[in-house]
Structure formats: C-alpha cells, structure tokens
Amino acid sequence: MRTMRGAALVLVLWLIALLTAMIGAFALTARVEALQGSMLRNGGQAQEYARAGMEYALSRLSSGEPQARWRPDGRRYRWQMDDANVEIRIIDESGKVDLNMAEPTLLAGLVRAVGGEAGRDVRLAGAIVDWRDGDTLTQPGGGAEDRDYADAGLPYGAKDGPFETLGELRLVLGMDAELYRKLLPHVTLYSGRSRPEARFATGPVLTAMGLDAQQLLAQRDAPLGLPGSDATLGGTDTYSIESRARLSQGREAVLRAVVRTGASALPGSAYTVLRWEEGAAVQ
C-alpha cells in the first residue's frame, strides 16, 4: 500500500514538473511573439516616418520662401515628427559624377579623392570607360576589355554598353568593395552631364574637378545674404534623398531614394522614383 502511495506521489510530482515546464514554455513563447510583434510594429512605424521625411524634404525644396527652402548640397537637416527624430540629407544629382558621361580624367580624380592609390586611379577610370563604350579598344594608360576580364578569371567581360544600375560599378575590373562603398555616394546615372554642377557637388567631387573644396563648402554655409550663400538654393529636378528615422524606443529605419520631380506616370504623384532602398540597414 505504501509502495502504491509512493509511486502515486512520484507520478504527481512528475506531472507537476511537466505542467510547470509547459506553462513556462508557453509563457516564453508568448513573450517572444509579443516582442516580435512589437519590433515589427515599431519597424513599420519607423519606415513610415522615414518616408514622411522624404515627402517633407521635397516640400521644403519647392518652398516659395528662400529662408525656408532646403538646399540640395548634402547638408543634413533634422526634423521632429511625433516621437520620431528624422535626419534628412538631399543632394542634387547634377552635383555627382555621371558614370555614363564623365571623362576619364574626372573619374580618375574622383578615385584619388576618395582614397584610391596613385596609378590605380587611371587604370580604374579607363576600365569604367571601357565598360560603357561600344568598342573593344582599351583606353590609353589603362582600362579593361573582355580579354582582361578573362585573364583575371572572371566569367564575364566588359559590358560595352551604358551603365544601367550603380551596382554595375562593382563588376568593373579592379573595383573592390571598399572603394565601391566610397565612390557610391558621389556617382550617378541621372545627370546627363559630363561635368558635375559645382554648386551641389560634394567635397570629393569638387576635388576631382580641380576646385578648392574647402573654400566652396565654406561659402555654402554662409548665412543668406552673404556672397555665395544662395548658390545652392533651387536645383534641377532630380535628387537623391536619404531619410533616417529613429523612434524614442531606439528603432531605426533608413530610406534612400533618387526621385525626379514634376509630372509622373503615376496619377496624383508629384515625382518619379528612379531608385528606392529602404529598411533597417540599407547599404
């Protein structure tokens, strides 16, 4: 009899332990799901604030009041919306180096300006031109055509056609991930200019153009009314916009877009999207 009671007690204890474990597992699962839901909700909110930042930037670019108008020269603007802090940066695409139009000397200058080694700049600039041109002749002083890609063990050759995406730059012979990352903020496919517009150019682009970047950037920062202070008011019609939203809980989202203002194929839209990247960790 005592043996049966002891066995029953052990069984009850095992059942209690099992139920406790099940309850704990259920509570943990519920907690994890709640946290996941909260993260998804906060992430979605952060993305919407980042999108709102882009829309707000476009409205400030077209403001009729010069004092209220934002300048598309790369300076950072901060905007508060509800509990989100939004940091916005706008660059007129005409101030960047157009990969399909720039001369080799300008491309080489940009490579040097972002830290590319001497000697490599000319070779890489030639390879960029060889990628986009329609012939099979290597650029003087450097470059890369199909045979050079084959010798490097790559399964592709020079495109012999215009760049269609900025990502193609990473495929050019001699380009590495670090240099690509440094060049990316300063190049475009949308200006159609062989030489960037200095009013909106970043420091490395100004240096590549042979201009005094320090002096020109200082003039942009001068208060309105002083010489050079209104140089970057206005702009063309194509802008790259980076909008970074951070919620009070710490959740962050980034939107990077290239947009062309004016008539759009989409009814009711005041701009056309040319490039769009968003998320928590846009590269």
UniProtKB/Swiss-Prot annotation:
Ion transport found in the keyword field: no
Keywords in alphabetical order: Cell inner membrane, Cell membrane, Membrane, Protein transport, Transmembrane, Transmembrane helix, Transport
Statement: the UniProt record of this protein carries the keyword Lipoprotein: no
SUPFAM superfamilies assigned: GspK insert domain-like
Post-translational modification: Cleaved by prepilin peptidase.
Chain segments annotated as coiled-coil in the UniProt record: none
InterPro entries linked: GspK (IPR005628), GspK_central_sf (IPR038072), T2SSK_SAM-like_1st (IPR049031)
Ranges annotated as spanning the membrane: 9-30
Name of the protein in its database record: Type II secretion system protein K
UniProt record similarity statement: Belongs to the GSP K family.
Gene source species: Xanthomonas campestris pv. campestris (strain ATCC 33913 / DSM 3586 / NCPPB 528 / LMG 568 / P 25)
Membrane topology (Periplasmic): 31-283
GO cellular component, one term: plasma membrane
Subunit structure: Type II secretion is composed of four main components: the outer membrane complex, the inner membrane complex, the cytoplasmic secretion ATPase and the periplasm-spanning pseudopilus. Interacts with core component XpsG.
GO biological process, one term: protein secretion
Major location (coarse): membrane
Positions of the pro-segment in this chain: 1-6
